[in-house]
Swiss-Prot record:
EC number: 1.18.1.-
N-terminal signal peptide: none
Protein name (Swiss-Prot/TrEMBL): Nitric oxide reductase FlRd-NAD(+) reductase
Gene name in the database record: norW
Catalytic activity field: 2 reduced [nitric oxide reductase rubredoxin domain] + NAD(+) + H(+) = 2 oxidized [nitric oxide reductase rubredoxin domain] + NADH
Length: 377
């Protein structure tokens, strides 16, 4: 008798995988185990909860029980997996164990919190659960410090500002979105945030946080300090690899998988934010959707290597949205930038004259798909 497929995790990657498996096989035993409630919510919505006055429970799209019934699953919510015996094909919690034929790690990633004095005062917004824990503090806060000027930090800064809060956005780098694109490209968003009233502290490093009668004092390495009501860490995500390590699976930044989403153990796979696919961590929706399609085939006996096309990444800053694609982080590209009142097109060209990356904003985003077709990958 088939012991079936076990998926550890309940986020977007896990759910996409379930849907793709069930399109091909209605009966293979499927078990999901996760530490949270397993209710479905749309994670990108977390970037807009404050301006839209949403509570954590407002984000719920489907209850876990409904999902289980719809897709014929066994669910084990609020269950911490303690260990994996890869040789015996057994997953263990504190008081249960499950046997599997194939195991999928969809354990996601955790928000990185800088190791500074007072780090326990920092909030993170990487899940519905985390937002539920701090939503009252964030709604009541008037002065907010966001540490990290990347994708999530920039989105949150705009959202909190649109909600009428006093926002300070801090980053070690000299420009926003520094790991994604050069300053001459990100400057349009940077100027817009400043015009909205966001106070930027660039080339700045946080040294410590202290609770005060008035709120929280944030002290920089420069010894400059500001008083705020809440501090949010938006300093990146770290793939959750602890379980994989305990199972003896090879990990690097993430759980290492090949083009078949297979780990170093032939019956263990990984998908989503926890996975490192041929050396790349791709915590974006489109690669996860494609990964789920291919992995479903492979779990059911197929042999389908994942092929990722050029894909768009969306920066969800509603007053100045951006789409980007290609190797925007490369430092050897020559950027051709056309900026008009209705938006910007920035093309990153190689020395051979090939389009290797682009960023488009506002009304010029409609040109993104045409540019994708000419992108050299």
């Amino acid at each position: 008798m088939s012991r079936g497929i076990i998926i550890i995790g309940s986020g977007f990657a896990a759910r996409q995988l379930v849907k793709n498996i069930r399109k091909q096989d209605a009966h293979v035993p499927l078990t999901l185990i996760a530490a949270d409630s397993m209710d479905e919510y749309n994670k990108p919505d977390l970037s807009h909860v404050i301006s839209q006055s949403q509570r954590a429970d407002d984000l719920t799209r489907q209850l876990a029980g409904e999902f289980a019934e719809q897709f014929n699953l066994r669910l084990f919510p609020h269950t911490w997996v303690a260990d994996i015996d890869a040789d015996a094909h057994v997953v263990k919690s504190q008081d249960k164990q499950w046997q599997y034929d194939k195991l999928v790690l969809a354990t996601g990633a955790t928000a990185f919190v800088p190791p500074i004095a007072g780090r326990e005062l920092m909030l993170t917004l990487n899940s519905q659960q985390e937002y539920r824990a701090c939503e009252t503090q964030l709604r009541d806060a008037q002065r907010v410090l966001i540490v990290g000027g990347g994708l999530i930090g920039s989105e949150l800064a705009m959202d909190f500002c649109r909600a009428g809060k006093t926002v300070t956005l801090m980053d070690n780098a000299a420009s926003l979105l520094a790991s994604l694109m050069p300053p001459e490209v990100s400057s349009r968003l940077q100027h817009h945030l400043t015009d909205m009233g966001v106070h930027l502290l660039l080339k700045s490093q946080l040294q410590k946080l202290e609770k005060t009668e008035a709120g929280i004092r944030a002290t920089l390495v420069s010894q400059h300090s500001i008083e705020v009501d809440a501090v949010i860490a938006a300093t990146g995500l770290r793939p959750e690899t602890a379980l994989a390590r305990r199972a003896g699976v090879v990990v690097n930044r993430g759980v290492c998988v090949d083009s078949y989403l297979q780990t170093s153990h032939p019956d263990i796979y990984a998908i989503g934010d926890c996975a490192e696919i041929n050396g790349q961590v791709l915590p974006f929706l489109q690669p996860i959707q494609l990964s789920a399609m291919y992995l479903a085939k492979n779990l059911l006996g197929g042999n389908a290597p994942l092929k990722l096309p050029a894909m768009l990444v969306k920066v969800k800053t509603p007053e100045l949205p951006l789409h980007l694609a290609g190797e925007t982080q490369r430092r050897d590209l020559s950027w051709q930038i056309t900026a008009e009142s209705d938006g910007m097109i920035a093309k990153g060209m190689s020395g051979e004259g090939q389009l290797r990356a682009f960023v488009v904003s506002e009304d010029r985003m409609k040109e993104a798909f045409a540019l994708l077709k000419t992108l050299s990958v």
